[in-house]
């Protein structure tokens, strides 16, 4: 398999160029001319090794899940795969959408995000996702869980374990984490699923901040990309966006 095999049959590649910025991948634009003479463009992301393969698969499945629910909100994913002549090199391919550098219109953006959360349905009725997704190059906890409290707690535990693995043990972190898991999370989240209350597992982008959103140049339609999805409480990733904007 090669990326060129996933392009429209009979098309001619007219140009390729680097496009976009990524900490983890090479990213580019592919321009082609279709058999009828119509120009068309594609975006490609290339990563290496086993982690790169897992990340390209995760992005394809994430973007496909969002596109299936709300196709106008994301560039159409096309394929992911491994290069035939470079077995350790992997790609994610989607349609190319020219975007402005401005933030999307907040009212249009919020309306689309709300629609995504409301229309999406977890295939298992649980919180999680069917394939491990990655926030940057870090794997997220996505195992299926019946309870939002349980899912969130295990997600936080995995994040803390990764922190300890990278930076070493911390007595202060141990003290804080015990309070977090024994008191804070149960007190804040358990009432959401008590006395008949329920939390709907909604499809969330997973890494929603200003650098992963834009507006289509032609339609001014808000778009999001670089998704690392899972089914969660619909507000769970808003704190990530606020933190990113605050420290930008």
Task: State where each predicted segment sits.
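Activation segment
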Residues: 99, 222, 228-230
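Hydrophobic "anchor" residues on beta-strands that sit immediately upstream
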Residues: 41, 91, 201-203, 222
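Conserved N-terminal boundary motif of the eukaryotic protein kinase catalytic domain
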Residues: 9-18
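Active-site activation/catalytic loop segments of kinase-like enzymes and analogous catalytic loops
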Residues: 162, 229-248
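ATP-binding pocket architecture of kinase catalytic cores
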Residues: 17-150, 154
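Hydrophobic HxD+1 residue recognition
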Residues: 208
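An alpha-helical support segment within catalytic cores of ATP-dependent transferases
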Residues: 2-7, 82-85, 121-205, 216-219
């Amino acid at each position: 398999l090669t990326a060129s095999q996933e392009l429209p049959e009979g098309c001619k590649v007219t140009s390729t160029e680097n496009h976009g910025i990524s900490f983890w991948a090479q990213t580019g634009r592919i321009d082609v001319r279709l058999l009828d003479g119509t120009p068309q463009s594609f975006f490609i992301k290339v990563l290496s090794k086993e982690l790169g393969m897992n990340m390209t698969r995760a992005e394809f499945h994430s973007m496909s899940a969002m596109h299936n629910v709300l196709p106008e909100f994301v560039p159409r994913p096309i394929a992911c795969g491994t290069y035939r002549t470079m077995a350790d090199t992997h790609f994610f391919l989607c349609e190319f959408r020219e975007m402005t550098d401005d933030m999307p219109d907040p009212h249009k953006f919020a309306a689309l995000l709300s629609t995504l959360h409301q229309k999406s349905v977890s295939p298992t009725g649980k919180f999680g996702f069917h394939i491990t997704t990655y926030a940057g190059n870090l794997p997220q906890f996505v195992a299926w869980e019946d309870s939002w409290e349980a899912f969130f707690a295990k997600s936080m535990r995995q994040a803390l374990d990764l922190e300890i693995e990278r930076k070493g043990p911390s007595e202060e972190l141990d003290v804080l984490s015990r309070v977090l898991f024994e008191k804070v999370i149960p007190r804040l989240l358990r009432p959401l699923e008590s006395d008949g209350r329920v939390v709907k597992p909604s499809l969330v982008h997973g890494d929603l901040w200003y650098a992963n959103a834009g507006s289509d140049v032609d339609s001014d339609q808000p778009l999001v990309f670089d998704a690392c999805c899972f089914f969660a409480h619909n507000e769970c990733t808003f704190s990530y966006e606020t933190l990113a904007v605050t420290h930008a």
